Every structure is written in C-alpha cells, then in structure tokens.
C-alpha cells in the first residue's frame, strides 16, 4: 500500500498534470477568440458560408477536416501577428494556399487553426522594367498568367492554372520552361518570409542567403512565405494542347516517349515539353492515353514533338496561342477542380533512358494484374505519368546557384520522374488503394535497381503520405539534410514549424 506521504505526492502530481492539461487546453481554446479580437475581418468561424467554402470543399476528400477556426491574413504583418497569437497559445495550425496536396494534414487540420493565404493575392511588377514580378503567396498560377500575358511575359510557373503558387515553388516546381531555367524555385530572386519570431524578412542572394537556398525545395520548414519575386522573360507565343488516345495507341505513345526521353531525342529541344499519361479505369477495365504537349514559340508543327502528334488520337487540340495563357484551358486535366473525389499521388524516379520508359509501362500493368483486389473498389481510376527532368534543366538549376534538391544526371539523359495518380469515390477503399500504390512504387524501384536504372529521389509535390519522411534524405544525393536542419535551427530555434504545424514534410521526421 502507498504511504500517506506517497499518496499525497501522487495526488499532487496528478492534480498538477490535470491543471497543466487544462491550462494548455484553455490557451488553445482562446487562440481563435484572440484572433477574432485582433483580426475580426480575417478570422472565420464554423457555421459561416465562407468557412464552408474554405474548409468543407478541399481539392481531395482525403483532406476533409474541421479546424477550430480559419485565419485568412490580408498582409505579411497580419501573418506575423496571427503567428504570435498561435505561438502564445501553443496552438497547432496548418497553412494552406490553394490546397492542391492530397496528403492528409499537409494543408489541413482538425482541432487546430487553419491559416489560409488566399487574401495574399497581389500580382505586380517590382519596377517599370517588368523584369521581376512580385506574387502574393495566395495566388493561383492562372492569376499570375493573366497579368503577365498583357506584356507577353512568362515565369517558370505551374503547368496548370488552378495550382497554387506557394506549394509548387516550395516543392521545387515543374514547369513548361524547366529545360532553360531549372526548377520554378530557381527563378525566385527574392522571398518575403515571416519567421517564427514574427520577423518579416527578405531572403535572396544577398540577404539571408542560406534561407534563400533552403526555400528552393525545402517546403514549409523555415517560415511562412508571403510573397515570391520571380524573374520574367518574353514568351509572345506558345504552341501546344492535349490529345486523348484509345488503347490501340498506347504502344505508339510509349514508343514516342522512349525516343523523346533521351539526349538525342526530342527532349534535347529546350522549347519542348511532353507529359504523357496512361490511364486505367479499374471499374470498366478500359485503358486509354492522354498527353499534354507544349513548345515555346509559334512553330505550328514542332519537330521535337512530331512523334506524338503523328499518333492517331480520339481527340486533339493543338494550336498556337498568345503566351501560356492562350493554352491554359487546353492543358488543365479535368480532375484539377474541387470535387467529391479522393485523390492520391505517389512518385519515384529513374535514370532516364528508353529502357526506363518501357520498364515503367510494363511494371504499371504487371502490378495491376497482380492486385485483383483493387477491382473491389468503387470507381477507381489510376494514372501513370512520365515527367522528364532534362539535362538542360539540371544544368540550369546548378547555374542559378543551386538548390537543396541537387539533381544530377547519371546517364546523360536526365532524370525520369514517375507520377502514379489515383482518384476514387469511397473512403472504405483507402487502405486497399494506398497499399496498391505502395506496391507499385516498391516493384518499380526493385526492378530499376536490378537494371541499374534506379534514381533515389521523390519529387515532393507528387509524394504519397507514406513517402513524407523520405523526401529530404534523398536531396542532393543524400548530402542536403544536415544543412537544411542547421538552417531550420538557425531561423526557428524553438521548432515552431516542426511541432506546431504537425502535417506535411518535416525535417524533424526525416531519418538522419
């Protein structure tokens, strides 16, 4: 039996623990109240129509959550003020720009505060030269392209207009202009960042240059970026569009990409871009193809893409448009709007070669055949998309000053990133589908390793929930993680962006 002294000590310990928990709960409950008091026009509570618009309609239903309240700051200063309130309350929170990330918790939260940056939506030139455009973090790329099109200008931005600026750039950034300029992040000349201590600072080649480097792919680990300043360049015309194919065209489509994805192929033209996909409808068993093709300039028949445009298609729409804006509607996949679907990305990479292209295609169909249980799911569609990081892109990224991602070119053909995508209707199928996609990645990685084609990289913006811990240890062939951690410790010594923002891609979760 406990002595009276031990009993009293235990009782006091329990009482103090309960008091501490109650104190923390009280502080957290007060976070939304304090946000409302300090920023009444920027704080949204459950029950309002605006709350429903911002929260109840995520892009992917896998991210359906209910935050305690929504905070929509209208300036960097409001971001800093709101962050101070959240820190004082020890309140967990998430930051969402456009929410185009299907990983639960990456840009959503339950029982915490959701900070949305959609009010940070200015797009303006830095000066009269129009060589730099200043983009608020809450914009979609379509908003940016509408401004730039008036001056026949472009930036290394997203391929699809509905995608958010912030998420794309903080994860690297695939663009139609990568071959000449590197990642989208490599064209950022300055970041406006709110640090954990509330300081609003600039990060560029001259100021906070270590933070500037880290933000080029380091995700949401160092602060809240409120503005991106990007270099512009002239693009008066773009040729491009999309094409749909039936099953009879799949072999020609894969053959065309096998020829394209080598240094002697069409990808050697830095103006060209090709992203073909193979689609499999699990419910119907139908197999089809889809391709997005772009070429900078007004050539109505670019030779670099002839192997694709020669393939008979069920539908195609190729034309010359004014700037990238003139083709945006023709190249945005239909599932990029908000809907009632559940979405999943999963990614891996290979050293690009014709053999790698064929391996990806064969593995895709082999794993589908080996997993008949997916036929029990409701309305599942699966895609296999090829995305090439060309030798020119890798050189341009290094020439810009480099980045944490640190791509290298193993065979001289660039790096072939593979995106497996899925969308389906019912949450009851999540476990089967998540395992199926992991099996797909594991099988492709194993086969690639046996052939000497494996490239140890996962593109952050296309990662699966099971891959969030693996991202940073793969950067720069395994050498970037210690430096990223050192920079995070310097700018966020209290680990606010490691612990109070629990979701997404965290340095603290990456294996040493």
Curated annotation (Swiss-Prot):
A molecular-function term among this protein's GO annotations: oxidoreductase activity
Family matches, as PROSITE patterns: FAD_PCMH (PS51387)
Signal peptide: 1-19
Alphabetical list of InterPro entries matching this protein: FAD-bd_PCMH, FAD-bd_PCMH-like_sf, FAD-bd_PCMH_sub2, FAD-linked_Oxidoreductase, Oxid_FAD_bind_N
Keyword Repeat belongs to the record: no
Keyword Hydrolase carried by entry: no
Function: FAD-dependent monooxygenase; part of the gene cluster that mediates the biosynthesis of PR-toxin, a bicyclic sesquiterpene belonging to the eremophilane class and acting as a mycotoxin. The first step of the pathway is catalyzed by the aristolochene synthase which performs the cyclization of trans,trans-farnesyl diphosphate (FPP) to the bicyclic sesquiterpene aristolochene. Following the formation of aristolochene, the non-oxygenated aristolochene is converted to the trioxygenated intermediate eremofortin B, via 7-epi-neopetasone.
Protein name (database record): FAD-dependent monooxygenase prx3
Organism taxonomic ancestry: Eukaryota, Fungi, Dikarya, Ascomycota, Pezizomycotina
Chain ranges of the FAD-binding PCMH-type domain: 63-235
Top-rank lineage group of the source organism: Eukaryota
Residues bearing the modification Pros-8alpha-FAD histidine: 100
Pathway: Sesquiterpene biosynthesis
Keyword annotations: FAD, Flavoprotein, Glycoprotein, Oxidoreductase, Signal
Protein source organism: Penicillium roqueforti (strain FM164)
Gene name in the database record: prx3
EC number: 1.-.-.-
